[in-house]
């Protein structure tokens, strides 16, 4: 009778225990489930701290759901991920709700992972992501969770009743392990993990070596482990050091210092010339390279001074003053491109100097003036700038030519000794100067000297006044004087049988002043060729009309030759100068190939014959022989000129003008 009485009591107690366990599990489940009202807003939940659901600030800010909670085994009461309500968990009071509470006892009695006897700080803060794979103890804080302690104490009162829930819990725990193996790939078998007795937990630290071998911890170890050696190994470490600019990398470079490395990486000596950061490219072009080097005074890098290493000073002089011919062959396109590229700050600063003092360096007058000047002069030839602000280039060039013959000084002294002033009538001076100005306009159309006229035009008056103060004449004044001296030499040789052979050499200062006044208008706009021919005809006819009172012209048929017989005694006649014109024409045909030939006054020919291959042209017969003029060669020139007169008179005046026009068109085309 005792036995039947005991069975109903046991069943009743079991029911009561199951009810209490189910109610406790339900409370624990609610406590771990997030409040949907709190997730929406902390003010939405009216219960506040008394709410039976979880209010977690971390979960409210974190939109991700807890992976372990969805699988039914989240053991972290302060999990930072969301624990949404699970469907059927509230109604199902069977095994699934008990999973979230009872695995603590199961892991405590049957540890599957070697755990250290240290509580997990991340678990207590709700941020441990390892779950049951953590090597530290996941024990809740008893002060924070007072509701779980009576639930855990009640099953311990009855050992018979406590065994069954524990067995049920262990059986139910196997199901989540199977689910984890399906979802998480690469999980090792829990039974294969080393088992450590409860008495040997304190020795587990030495056995495991602080790094557990379970799978949940492997991704973190593999990320950290190979990462640290990668900074010290060869290839990858150097890439990282170069990427992040390590200071140790500067000590390599094949054992060289930082200064050596910087010097080797410099693209050139002219990178920071004049602190011009925008113009710091490596100049391989000849014009920019030469300009930069001359501004800095480095003549050895300049292409015009390529022979300086040989020590040939004569070659240095020829290269310096013959470089314009070499630059001339390079074409206008390259010159235009280089000039556009040089439109920089220094180009704008020296723009006025370039316009005013751009004179061909092959000109003898410029060379003479340059030697007399105390400071350097800036010039521009073909779009290439040269400047020597400290006159170091000029001084070095003058010192390099101490052993060479003083050709410039000899020619200047010879010219100064022989130049004399002669008188001319106002009518003659006007016509001849107009012809010279017209010839200057025609020559200005040539490409090699196209900009010379415009650049010298604004400098005439300034040079004239400045040179008078310095004590020597301007280049244009010396050129006019040399032209007059050249004209007077053949004429005197032709008229040496007459009582006054030096009559044509005199020139008054008054008319020279008038010619200087007219020279201001000599570089006006170019005139058409028809206008030039008209002026030449008017000058030829006007000269004979103005001097009709003093001249008588007679024709002599012998040899079909026109001879001009002058009867003037005090004034200079104009018609005999036609013979001088023929002299210059014949000489230019013989010695200057391809040059324009004009049948006009000798003053016109002065612009045609004063330069020959970059050197100043002197007529035949003008040679220095003990300070006296050699007239023998000059007489031969006169004879050649008379033959030219004969040929010119036979052709006729109309045919001569047509020939001139044809030749001019061919030269311009």
Swiss-Prot record:
Statement: the UniProt record of this protein carries the keyword Repeat: yes
GO biological process, one term: positive regulation of DNA-templated transcription
UniProt feature, compositional bias: Low complexity: 1-11
Protein name: Zinc finger CCCH domain-containing protein 17
Entries under SMART domains matching the protein: ZnF_C3H1
C3H1-type zinc finger locations on the chain: 34-58, 60-86, 114-141
Superkingdom field: Eukaryota
Single annotated GO MF: mRNA binding
GO cellular component: nucleus
Keywords on record: DNA-binding, Metal-binding, Repeat, Zinc, Zinc-finger
SUPFAM superfamilies in the record: CCCH zinc finger (SSF90229)
InterPro entries: Znf-CCCH_3 (IPR041686), Znf_CCCH (IPR000571), Znf_CCCH_sf (IPR036855)
Pfam families xrefs: zf-CCCH_2, zf-CCCH_3
Disordered, as annotated region: 1-23, 150-175, 285-306, 376-589, 642-669
Compositionally skewed regions (Basic and acidic residues) per UniProt: 164-175, 285-299, 392-406, 420-464, 478-499, 547-579, 660-669
Residue ranges with Acidic residues bias: 580-589, 642-659
Origin organism lineage: Eukaryota, Viridiplantae, Streptophyta, Embryophyta, Tracheophyta
Keyword hit for Transferase: no
């Amino acid at each position: 009778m005792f036995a039947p009485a005991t069975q109903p009591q046991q069943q009743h107690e079991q029911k009561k225990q199951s009810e209490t366990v189910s109610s406790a599990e339900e409370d624990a489940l609610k406590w771990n489930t997030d409040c949907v009202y709190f997730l929406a807003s902390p003010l939405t939940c009216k219960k506040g701290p008394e709410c039976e659901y979880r209010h977690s600030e971390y979960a409210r800010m974190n939109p991700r759901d807890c992976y372990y909670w969805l699988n039914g085994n989240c053991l972290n009461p302060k999990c930072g991920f969301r624990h949404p309500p699970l469907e059927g968990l509230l109604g199902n009071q069977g095994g699934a709700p008990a999973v979230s509470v009872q695995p603590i006892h199961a892991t405590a009695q049957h540890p599957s992972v070697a755990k250290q006897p240290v509580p997990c700080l991340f678990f207590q803060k709700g941020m441990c992501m390892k779950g049951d794979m953590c090597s530290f103890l996941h024990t809740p804080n008893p002060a924070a969770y007072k509701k779980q302690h009576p639930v855990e104490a009640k099953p311990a009162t009855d050992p018979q009743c406590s065994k069954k829930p524990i067995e049920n819990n262990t059986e139910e725990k196997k199901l989540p392990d199977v689910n984890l193996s399906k979802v998480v790939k690469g999980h090792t078998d829990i039974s294969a993990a080393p088992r450590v007795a409860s008495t040997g937990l304190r020795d587990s630290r030495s056995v495991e070596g602080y790094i557990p071998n379970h799978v949940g911890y492997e991704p973190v170890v593999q990320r950290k482990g190979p990462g640290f050696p990668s900074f010290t190994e060869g290839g990858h470490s150097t890439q990282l050091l170069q990427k992040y600019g390590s200071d140790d990398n500067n000590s390599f470079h094949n054992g060289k210092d930082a200064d050596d490395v910087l010097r080797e990486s410099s693209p050139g000596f002219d990178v920071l010339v004049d602190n011009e950061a925008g113009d710091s490219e490596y100049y391989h072009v000849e014009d920019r390279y030469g300009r930069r080097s001359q501004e800095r005074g480095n003549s050895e890098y300049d292409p015009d001074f390529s022979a300086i290493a040989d020590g040939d000073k004569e070659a240095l002089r020829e290269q310096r003053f013959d470089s314009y011919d070499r630059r001339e062959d390079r074409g206008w396109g390259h010159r235009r491109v280089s000039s556009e590229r040089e439109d920089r700050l220094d180009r704008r600063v020296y723009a006025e100097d370039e316009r005013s003092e751009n004179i061909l360096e092959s000109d003898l007058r410029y060379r003479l003036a340059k030697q007399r000047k105390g400071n350097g002069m800036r010039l521009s030839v073909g779009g290439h700038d040269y400047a020597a602000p400290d006159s170091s280039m000029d001084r070095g060039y003058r010192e390099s030519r101490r052993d060479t013959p003083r050709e410039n000084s000899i020619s200047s002294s010879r010219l100064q000794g022989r130049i004399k002033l002669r008188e001319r009538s106002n009518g003659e001076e006007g016509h001849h100067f107009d012809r010279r100005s017209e010839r200057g306009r025609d020559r200005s159309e040539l490409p090699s000297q196209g900009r010379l006229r415009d650049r010298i035009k604004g400098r005439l008056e300034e040079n004239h006044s400045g040179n008078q103060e310095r004590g020597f004449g301007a280049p244009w004044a010396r050129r006019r004087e040399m032209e007059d001296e050249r004209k007077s030499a053949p004429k005197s040789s032709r008229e040496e049988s007459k009582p006054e052979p030096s009559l044509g050499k005199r020139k008054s200062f008054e008319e020279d002043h008038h010619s200087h006044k007219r020279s201001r208008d000599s570089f006006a706009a170019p005139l058409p060729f028809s206008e030039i021919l008209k002026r030449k005809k008017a000058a030829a006819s006007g000269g004979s009309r103005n001097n009709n009172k003093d001249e008588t012209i007679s024709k002599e048929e012998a040899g079909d030759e026109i001879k001009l017989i002058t009867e003037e005694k005090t004034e200079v006649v104009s018609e005999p100068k036609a013979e001088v014109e023929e002299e210059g024409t014949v000489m230019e045909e013989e010695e200057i190939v391809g040059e324009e030939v004009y049948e006009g006054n000798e003053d016109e020919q002065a612009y045609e014959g004063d330069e020959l291959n970059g050197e100043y042209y002197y007529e035949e017969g003008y040679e220095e022989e003990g300070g006296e003029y050699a007239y023998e060669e000059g007489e031969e020139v006169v004879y050649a000129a008379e033959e030219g007169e004969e040929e010119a008179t036979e052709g006729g005046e109309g045919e001569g003008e047509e020939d001139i026009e044809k030749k001019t068109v061919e030269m311009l085309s």
